[in-house]
From Swiss-Prot:
<keyword id="KW-0918">Phosphonate transport</keyword>
<feature type="compositionally biased region" description="Basic and acidic residues">
    <location>
        <begin position="254"/>
        <end position="272"/>
    </location>
</feature>
<keyword id="KW-0997">Cell inner membrane</keyword>
<comment type="subunit">
    <text>The complex is composed of two ATP-binding proteins (PhnC), two transmembrane proteins (PhnE) and a solute-binding protein (PhnD).</text>
</comment>
<keyword id="KW-0547">Nucleotide-binding</keyword>
<feature type="binding site">
    <location>
        <begin position="35"/>
        <end position="42"/>
    </location>
    <ligand>
        <name>ATP</name>
    </ligand>
</feature>
<dbReference type="GO" id="GO:0005524">
    <property type="term" value="F:ATP binding"/>
</dbReference>
<feature type="region of interest" description="Disordered">
    <location>
        <begin position="248"/>
        <end position="272"/>
    </location>
</feature>
<dbReference type="InterPro" id="IPR003439">
    <property type="entry name" value="ABC_transporter-like_ATP-bd"/>
</dbReference>
<dbReference type="GO" id="GO:0015416">
    <property type="term" value="F:ABC-type phosphonate transporter activity"/>
</dbReference>
<dbReference type="InterPro" id="IPR050086">
    <property type="entry name" value="MetN_ABC_transporter-like"/>
</dbReference>
<comment type="function">
    <text>Part of the ABC transporter complex PhnCDE involved in phosphonates import. Responsible for energy coupling to the transport system.</text>
</comment>
<dbReference type="InterPro" id="IPR012693">
    <property type="entry name" value="ABC_transpr_PhnC"/>
</dbReference>
<dbReference type="InterPro" id="IPR017871">
    <property type="entry name" value="ABC_transporter-like_CS"/>
</dbReference>
<dbReference type="GO" id="GO:0016887">
    <property type="term" value="F:ATP hydrolysis activity"/>
</dbReference>
<comment type="similarity">
    <text>Belongs to the ABC transporter superfamily. Phosphonates importer (TC 3.A.1.9.1) family.</text>
</comment>
<keyword id="KW-0067">ATP-binding</keyword>
Length: 272
């Protein structure tokens, strides 16, 4: 279970991105984060995995407060957090199988990770995961030969290879067509239910969020202004969340809120 208690983020400029955000995500529940540009959705995800240090509050993953741990313990805890990225974050020249196995880098000795010699158990599990996401036949294909939807499936398998206690998903369908977007969202929902995983999904597509999320949390100016079932998301609630912004065409968070090296930083920390 993930629990956020009065999580706050204020930057050195004085700008407050998150204002005492409190919410709990039980095991097996998939929560969608919605809101206008600059609402704090990406900042919230970056605070949870500590790519950004929160200014206050607690981040409880099980009985561990991620906001309070030191660097060494944080590296260990990041193994428990699976990340699925909009940009896929695959190593293009490596095979699909090698990319999935990279999710195990934080669990093997340095010499094994350097030579990419993984235990048999990890390899067998990677094959099972590729079968689950529908890519078993592509195990030996290079990542750069895959379609966008296939690359995202590899990203899902890699995150699951970590055997995480939490999934953080950052706009997984922003680069995909509508049909593939539905397939990816359905897959994320299914694997979380199968593994009893809590998940938070930053999603800009409101109708897609209403269709697939167990629960929706609406952010506006860094505050939670809605927390409830998708069926409760009516025009009045949407106006509260989005204000004057057209929610039907709401785009991604602005560039300043997501640093370009975030993906590499997370994967590097997991692999240490």
């Amino acid at each position: 279970m993930l629990e956020l208690q009065r999580l706050t983020k204020t930057y050195a400029t004085g700008d407050t991105a998150l204002r005492e955000v409190s919410l709990a995500v039980p095991r097996g529940q998939v929560v969608g984060l919605i809101g206008p540009s600059g609402a704090g959705k990406s900042t919230l995800i970056r605070c949870i995995n500590r790519l950004v240090a929160p200014s206050g509050g607690r981040i409880l993953l099980g009985d561990v407060d991620l906001a309070a741990v030191g660097r060494a313990e944080l590296r260990r805890q990041r193994r428990r957090i699976g990340m699925i990225f909009q940009e896929y974050a695959l190593v293009e020249r490596l095979t699909v199988m090698e990319n999935v196995l990279s999710g195990r880098l934080g669990y093997v000795p340095f010499w094994r990770s350097f030579t990419r010699r993984f235990p048999g158990r990890d390899i067998e599990n990677a094959y099972r995961l590729l079968d689950r996401v529908g890519l078993l036949a592509h195990a030996d294909k290079r990542a750069d030969a895959l379609s966008g939807g296939q690359r995202q499936r590899v990203g899902i398998a890699r995150a699951l290879a970590q055997e995480p206690a939490l999934l953080l998903v950052d706009e997984p369908t922003a680069s995909l067509d509508p049909k593939t977007s539905r397939q990816i969202m359905r897959l994320i929902l299914e694997v979380c239910e199968e593994r009893d995983l809590p998940a938070i999904v930053n999603i800009h597509d409101v109708p897609l969020a209403q269709q697939f999320m167990h629960r929706l949390v609406g952010l506006h100016a860094g505050e939670v202004v809605f927390d409830g079932a998708p069926v409760a998301l009516d025009e009045t609630v949407l106006a509260t969340i989005y204000g004057a912004e057209d929610w039907a065409s709401s785009g991604r968070e602005p560039a300043p809120e997501r640093e370009p090296e975030d993906t590499e930083r997370h994967l590097a920390e997991v692999g240490r």
